[in-house]
Swiss-Prot record:
Belongs to the TRAFAC class translation factor GTPase superfamily. Classic translation factor GTPase family. LepA subfamily. This is Elongation factor 4. It is found in: Cell inner membrane. Gene3D superfamilies: 3.30.70.240, Elongation factor 4, C-terminal domain (3.30.70.2570), Elongation Factor G (Translational Gtpase), domain 3 (3.30.70.870), P-loop containing nucleotide triphosphate hydrolases (3.40.50.300), Translation factors (2.40.30.10). Required for accurate and efficient protein synthesis under certain stress conditions. May act as a fidelity factor of the translation reaction, by catalyzing a one-codon backward translocation of tRNAs on improperly translocated ribosomes. Back-translocation proceeds from a post-translocation (POST) complex to a pre-translocation (PRE) complex, thus giving elongation factor G a second chance to translocate the tRNAs correctly. Binds to ribosomes in a GTP-dependent manner. Residues 7-189 form the tr-type G domain. It catalyses: GTP + H2O = GDP + phosphate + H(+). It comes from Nostoc sp. (strain PCC 7120 / SAG 25.82 / UTEX 2576). GO terms for biological process: positive regulation of translation; translation. Disulfide bonds: none annotated. CDD domains: EF4_II, EF4_III, LepA, lepA_C. It comes from the Bacteria.
Length: 603
């Protein structure tokens, strides 16, 4: 099965914005080449996580090997590597691009180029991939292929004379796409006789076989039974299972340069088989590793605590298993006076955080409390030390810090010009600095802003979508740290600070934020037998306060008329009890209160 010469192998991926039809196109290619028969076919075949199907997005990378008889009569092997399209998952995209020589750029013929498509195209150009433009959904009544071709040529600078018009849903243009892949995507270089170097582009954990690694052989040959060495983690393993993904796993005995496959080697932890690592042979090690791998740095942090303290170990185990599949997830144990034991987790963005939370709850049956997301702040102390703080409760006291710097991102939005005003207003409300505005083609504009990441991670994306009725798209990347007058906003309930509700905010926004948090918590915290004060403070200065009135039992219900002193005695006894209760009683803060903090409308 693997005796195909490198000249007849094509490795390609599909780049597209969310909802431009990438997974459907992948389904059609699998059907057209007979890789999956009609009986097994289901929508979004390569999206094999329930969550992916439900949300209609691709999260984990998939790969599929297709055999294709081209018009020139030759038999070709096409390796399709599926890529996610959401802004949070750009690290997964860069790994899959490194394993390819070509890319299909899928653009919705009715919507045109979107911001995320642009970001991925630039990544593909950095990897020197041959890009084939495909205009999808041309069967829609609103499709305007000529306008979109103009957009691609103008915005990306690609020659679209060979653009393919297709409709994955109707199966139009599928054969043209396959032919274009054969003709235009360059074959992998024939480096079979060099020392083995292979790139890991994905891995997942199988409870029976350990970690299964997806890889692309760059140079040399790998055989079943070989002892391999992973260059970054410096571990050795023996390959006990080797195969290709077609798209289900089929064992083979060896794979040559240019081929894509998987192997199992009883690897216990995914941390030992890091994505982007280079595989080589123990007895003939490559001199240098493959270039281009960078550690994925989390941008957003939050605390995760099990509602039931007994589930702490289960949560640790679940996070370890998710980390297996998700190189970008980071976590470390933390304790909170309000919530007990839990973990501080780092994510690439908000969608990534939601997905991890949902997978923990769905796949591992955990009930979690998630604290408000925060970003990594840089604190310069009075002694001149640089500290990186991802948890507001670790912030040094005001007297010990010289200044606080926060991360800024460059946000590029592509939007119909009708919504430019409202998006500019949103960006300015989020402390954005206007940088640039370009008119692309008729009716579409790009806006460029520099905005603090803390303002983007809460609900900027949702706000942008709702203000533009879903038409605008955005892409962001980190541009560095800048100093701002930031303060730590503490929330005190019944006189005790709740560390999980603390946040770092801009001084100008602190009052409004404190007021709305106090009001929100007043609605959400259930009434207790005693009066509960809620205060928002900066340092020792209280800037907003509310209180929840006590529930009181009518102790006079059984007194009919009679002497006032009897009633007074009962009321004083009740007051004394309330006083004692207030000093020892604890206030339960429900999960909704933490979620409400996430959704505080800042716009």
């Amino acid at each position: 099965m693997t005796d195909v010469p490198a000249v007849r192998i094509r490795n390609f991926c599909i780049i597209a914005h969310i909802d431009h039809g990438k997974s459907t196109l992948a389904d059609r290619l699998l059907q057209a080449t007979g890789t999956v028969d009609e009986r097994q076919m289901k929508e979004q075949f390569l999206d094999n996580m329930d969550l992916e199907r439900e949300r209609g997005i691709t999260i984990k990378l998939q790969a599929a090997r297709m055999n294709y008889q081209a018009k020139d009569g030759q038999q070709y092997v096409l390796n399709l590597i599926d890529t996610p399209g959401h802004v949070d998952f750009s690290y997964e995209v860069s790994r899959s691009l490194a394993a390819c020589e070509g890319a299909l750029l899928v653009v919705d013929a009715s919507q045109g180029v979107e911001a995320q498509t642009l970001a991925n195209v630039y990544l593909a150009l950095e990897h020197n991939l041959e890009i084939i433009p495909v205009l999808n959904k041309i069967d829609l009544p609103g499709a305007e292929p000529d306008r979109v071709v103009g957009e691609i040529e103008e915005i990306i600078g690609l020659d679209c004379s060979g653009a393919i018009l297709a409709s994955a849903k109707e199966g139009i243009g599928i054969n043209e796409i396959l032919e274009a892949v054969v003709e235009r995507v360059p074959p992998p270089p024939n480096t079979v006789d060099q020392r083995l170097r292979a790139l890991i582009f994905d891995s997942y954990y199988d409870i029976y076989r350990g970690v299964i690694v997806y890889f692309r052989v760059m140079d040399g040959t790998v055989k079943k039974g070989d002892r391999v060495y992973l260059m970054a983690s410096e571990k050795e393993y023996e390959i006990d299972e080797l195969g290709v993904l077609s798209p289900t796993q089929k064992p083979v005995n060896e794979l040559h340069a240019g081929e894509v496959g998987y192997f199992g080697a009883a690897i216990k932890a995914v941390a030992d088989a890091r994505v982007g690592d280079t595989i080589t042979l123990c007895n003939a090690k490559a001199t240098e590793a493959l270039p281009g791998y960078t550690e994925a740095n989390p941008m957003v942090f939050c605390g995760m605590f099990p509602i039931d303290a007994d589930q702490f170990e289960d949560l640790r185990e679940a996070l370890e298993k998710l980390r297996l599949n998700d190189a970008a997830l980071q976590y470390e144990p933390e304790t909170s006076s309000a919530m007990g034991f839990g973990f501080r987790c780092g994510f690439l963005g908000l969608l990534h955080m939601e997905i991890v939370q949902e997978r923990l709850e769905r796949e591992y049956d955990l009930d979690l409390i998630i604290t408000a997301p925060s970003v990594v702040y840089k604190v310069i102390t009075t002694k001149g030390e640089e500290l990186y703080i991802d948890n507001p409760s670790h912030l040094p006291a005001p007297n010990d810090r010289e200044r606080i710097e926060e991360p800024y991102v460059k946000v590029e939005m592509i939007t119909p010009e009708t919504y430019v005003g409202t998006l500019m207003e949103l960006s300015q409300n989020r402390r954005g600095i206007f940088k640039d505005m370009k008119y692309l083609t008729q009716g579409r504009t790009t806006l460029t802003y520099e905005i603090p990441l803390a303002e983007v991670v809460t609900d900027f994306f949702d706000q942008m979508k709702s203000r533009s009725r879903g038409y605008a798209s955005m892409e962001y990347h980190l541009i560095g740290y800048r100093e701002n007058p930031l303060v730590k906003l503490d929330i005190m309930i019944n006189g005790d600070p709740v560390d999980s509700l603390a946040m770092i905010v801009h001084r100008d926004k602190a009052y409004g934020m404190g007021r709305s948090m106090a009001e929100k918590l007043k609605e959400l915290i259930p009434r207790h037998q005693f009066k509960v004060p809620i205060q928002a403070s900066i340092g020792s200065k209280v800037i907003a306060s509310e209180h929840i009135p006590a529930l009181r039992k009518d102790v006079l219900a059984k007194c009919y008329g009679g002497d006032i002193s009897r009633k007074k005695k009962l009321l004083q006894k009740q007051a004394k009890g309330k006083k004692r209760m207030k000093s020892v009683g604890t206030v339960d803060v429900p999960q909704e209160a933490f979620m409400a903090v996430l959704r505080l409308d800042q716009s």
